[in-house]
């Protein structure tokens, strides 16, 4: 009968018949001692008892051919507290399968923690939305654990409609954050060049740079969105005196030449604008009011919504139809073609001289 001595106490193992189970019997001294309680400890399969003469374990005992009487002093002492020493050397090193199983269990535990921390199952899992994404910061919570627990459980107490509304609000907030980030990135990259920015620069340039020399009448034309490009500050040519009254054909020609010269240099455009102001100052009151009404009319016309390069022809193609758009408002009187061309050149330069006037007479 095998015997095991644990901390000096004798435990006798006895098998109940061939193929039966093994039972542990203690001595009367151990059983009568209240400080001792027998606990069933399952030893690993590879543990061998050298005192029995053959390798036997608690799970697979084999009946010895002849009983052997073994003294209790010769039995080895087993330290129950040291679990590593109880394992055999072949089982102390973990195999790759056991490491993989440990990694899988650890990953499963981590994923479960993340799922409990980030997402919460809702009542919308029936084919619509499986989880409500509620981001919770991983930093140290400032609230008490009871408050956090109530915040987690508050969603499940809501009705289905309130849950859907809360989810829709969260999705809308995420879309707003994403759109704000995209706009910030595009503004950093310089892609956010809209018409509003041009309009702001345009009006700002008029108020600061061009308000003094241009006057209020041309500012009305600018604010009427007649020109689709911002005006840059250019060199202002000195004004010259004009003592002659300008005819309607000169006004129409100057308007067309002014529109054609927008693509030119800033100095040429500024001189044309100054010439228009001089012409406006010399007009009678009736014609001056008609000239002021050109800005709103041209702003409403769809022709001026197209780029200036499309509405203005080349100098070779411009001469036959130079004042086609202005003939409805200002009919041209009968006269020679040379005089019209000369007046157009005078208006495009923005200066009316006395020598050219004498030639016209």
Swiss-Prot record:
Polar residues bias: start-end ranges: 341-351
Family per record: Belongs to the FAM131 family.
PANTHER family cross-referenced by the UniProt entry: PROTEIN FAM131A, PROTEIN FAM131B-RELATED
Superkingdom, natural source: Eukaryota
Protein name: Protein FAM131A
Stretches the record annotates as Disordered: 341-361
Gene name of the record: Fam131a
Organism: Mus musculus
């Amino acid at each position: 009968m095998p015997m095991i001595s644990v901390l000096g106490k004798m435990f006798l193992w006895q098998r109940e018949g061939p193929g039966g189970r093994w039972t542990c019997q203690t001595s009367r001294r151990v059983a009568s001692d209240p400080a001792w309680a027998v606990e069933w400890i399952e030893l690993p399969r590879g543990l061998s008892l050298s005192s029995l003469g053959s390798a036997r374990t608690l799970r697979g005992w084999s009946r010895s051919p002849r009983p052997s009487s073994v003294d209790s002093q010769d039995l080895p002492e087993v330290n129950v507290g040291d679990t590593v020493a109880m394992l055999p050397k072949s089982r102390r090193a973990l195999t790759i399968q056991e490491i993989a199983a440990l990694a899988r269990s650890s990953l499963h535990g981590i994923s479960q923690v993340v799922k409990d921390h980030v997402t919460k199952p809702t009542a919308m899992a029936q084919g619509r939305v499986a989880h409500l994404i509620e981001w919770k910061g991983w930093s140290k919570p400032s609230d008490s654990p009871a408050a956090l627990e109530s915040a987690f459980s508050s969603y499940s107490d809501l009705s289905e409609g309130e849950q859907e509304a809360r989810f829709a609000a969260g999705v809308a907030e995420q879309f707003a954050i994403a759109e704000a980030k995209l706009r910030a990135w595009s503004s950093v990259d310089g892609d956010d060049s809209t018409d509003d920015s041009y309009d702001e620069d345009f009006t700002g340039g008029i108020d600061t740079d061009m308000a003094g020399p241009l006057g209020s009448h041309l500012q009305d034309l600018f604010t009427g969105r007649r020109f689709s490009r911002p005006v840059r500050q250019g060199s202002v040519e000195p004004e010259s005196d004009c003592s002659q009254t300008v005819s309607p054909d000169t006004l129409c020609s100057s308007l067309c030449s002014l529109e054609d010269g927008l693509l030119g240099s800033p100095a040429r455009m500024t001189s044309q604008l100054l010439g228009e102001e001089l012409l406006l100052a010399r007009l009678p009151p009736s014609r001056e009011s008609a000239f002021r009404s050109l800005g709103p009319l041209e702003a409403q016309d769809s022709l001026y919504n197209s780029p200036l390069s499309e509405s203005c022809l080349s100098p070779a193609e411009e001469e036959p139809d130079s004042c086609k758009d202005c003939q409805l408002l200002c009919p041209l009187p009968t006269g020679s073609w040379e005089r019209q061309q000369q007046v157009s050149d005078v208006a495009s330069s923005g200066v009316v001289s006395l020598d050219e006037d004498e030639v016209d007479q």
